[in-house]
Each structure stands twice: as C-alpha cells, then as structure tokens.
C-alpha cells in the first residue's frame, strides 16, 4: 500500500507522458483533490516554500483505512523530500506502530493514531515533532483508491520471492500479475514474512516500480480519464493545481535519484500490554540529520 500511494504522487510530480495530454482534465481533478489545512506554513519554517526559487520541499504521504463509522488510521506514513538542485528525492517510511509523542495530547502512542485523533493536521504535527523537520504538504489516499488505480492500469507485474497466502489469495514464487485487491493483499502481508514489516516494504518497492512503468505506457495515456476520476475520488492534498504544474516543470529531475532511508534499528516492545515499535533516539537523530540536509535546513 505504501508504494501504491507513492506511485500516485510520482504520477503527479514527475511528469509521465500523459501529463500534458490531459492538462485540462487534471485541472478539473485537482479541484476535487484540493483540501487545504488550517495553517499557511509549518511552525518549523519561517517562510513558505517558494517553487519559483526551486526550494526543496517535503510531503507527508498518508494511506488511510477508513471504515464506516470509524475516523480511520493512517496505515501508511511516508515522508518524502524533494531537492531539485541535488536532483534527488528521499523517502522515509515510518512504521505504523512506532512509539511516538502525539502532538497536542501530551502522551505517547502508536504514531498512526495521530490521524484518528486529529486528522491530517495532527498527523503532520506529530511527524514534524518526531523528525524535527517541516512538512510542507500532504497527500492522503483512501486505500480503496489504491485498488482502483491498479485496476485502471490493468494490473501490476511483480516477481515474488516468498510463497505465501494473504487475504484469500495465494502468491507463489515467480512472475505474477496482480489486480487491485490482490496487490493490496500482497503489500499488507507481514506476519508470515521472516523480515516482518521490512519484508513487506521490499514488496511495496516492487509495486511502485511496476506502477510507474504502467503509468508511462501508451495504454495508460488512453485510460487517462479513468485514472483522473480515480484520483479525484480517492486522493486529497493541499497542493494546488498551479503548484503541481510548477513541480512538474521544475522538479521532475529530482526523480532521477530516489533514495530510501529507514528506521529499521528499532525493537518490538510491549508497553502496558500493547505492542509498539520503539526506535532508539540515536537512530531518529541520524534520520533527522539526513532529512534536514535534504531540505537544506542547516
């Protein structure tokens, strides 16, 4: 799911071949997607990011599992920094069970609870506090939208290295073509993986590569209307249409070098009978240093 979410972002910001073909359609879809939050600039910035000056910027990607009568939790939390001068994009996936201080509540809990307690704004502020960086923008996707996107693309191709069953589907070793529901199950499995959540992230990395390949194909261009409808229905962001255009024009070379960093030095602990993923302070400090460097916050 994480990588399906990231792929939606890259389809927006790195300029697939269909971008200019569907300029006006994207404008319409972006109006449906646009959902500002109650702040103009992060408390960790003095000034707003300037796309005209090609400032580095950051995005919090949220994959939300919302059910009827439930505010939902962010099953996916990814921080993305984009630096056009370095021609580099950095991705940090935050394990959903991470033990963290929840902004505005004065207590610690699983970091994915922040969204359930206070929506996008509290989720952003919680991650900002943990990583000591500003989060300039967010992109939120309904998990059901991930299914829709995969299906519109005609499925995704993966090479599976671990035979397992998940969500009622069997995934044998070898080359597979997955539809949306299968892809969700493929990316959610972690209990039977010897590498746990990090094994799941490896499968998710493969999903994004497949989605990006499909996203730049001729068949995708011909199905652009369906893709944009899926985006408009399932994706929300505080990025405006003009900002998306600026990113497409001036930042797409940042996708030339995509680096993933991780928080894999944590340990599994039970605190008051509840399972958490506890990350050492020195690990968080090291990640803070990397991300602040990418945002040129010295």
What residue spans do the PLM features occupy?
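Non-catalytic, solvent-exposed segments at the cell envelope interface
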Residues: 1-10, 14-298
């Amino acid at each position: 799911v994480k990588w399906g979410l990231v792929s939606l972002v890259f389809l927006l910001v790195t300029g697939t071949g269909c971008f200019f073909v569907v300029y006006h359609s994207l404008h319409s879809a972006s109006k449906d997607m646009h959902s500002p939050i109650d702040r103009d600039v992060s408390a960790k910035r003095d000034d707003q990011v300037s796309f005209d000056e090609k400032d580095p910027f950051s995005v919090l990607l949220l994959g939300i599992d919302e059910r009827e009568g439930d505010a939902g939790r962010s099953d996916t939390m990814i921080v993305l920094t984009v630096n056009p001068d370095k021609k580099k994009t950095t991705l940090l996936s935050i394990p959903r069970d991470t033990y963290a201080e929840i902004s505005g509540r004065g207590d610690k809990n699983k970091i994915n609870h922040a969204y359930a307690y206070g929506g996008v704004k509290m989720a952003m502020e919680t991650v900002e506090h943990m990583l000591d960086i500003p989060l300039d923008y967010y992109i939120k996707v309904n998990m059901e939208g991930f299914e829709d996107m995969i299906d519109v693309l005609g499925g995704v191709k993966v090479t599976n290295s671990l035979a397992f069953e998940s969500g009622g589907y069997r995934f044998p070793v070898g080359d597979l073509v997955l539809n949306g529901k299968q892809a969700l199950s493929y990316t959610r499995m972690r209990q039977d993986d010897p590498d746990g959540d990090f094994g799941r992230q490896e499968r998710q990395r493969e999903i994004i590569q497949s989605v990006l390949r499909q996203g730049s194909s001729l068949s995708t261009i011909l199905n652009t209307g369906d893709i944009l409808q899926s985006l408009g229905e399932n994706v929300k962001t505080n990025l405006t249409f003009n900002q998306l255009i600026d990113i497409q024009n001036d930042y797409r070379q940042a996708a030339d070098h995509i680096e993933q960093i991780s928080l894999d030095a944590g340990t599994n602990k039970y605190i008051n009978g509840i399972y958490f993923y506890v990350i050492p302070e020195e690990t968080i400090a090291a990640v803070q240093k990397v991300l602040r460097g990418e945002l040129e916050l010295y």
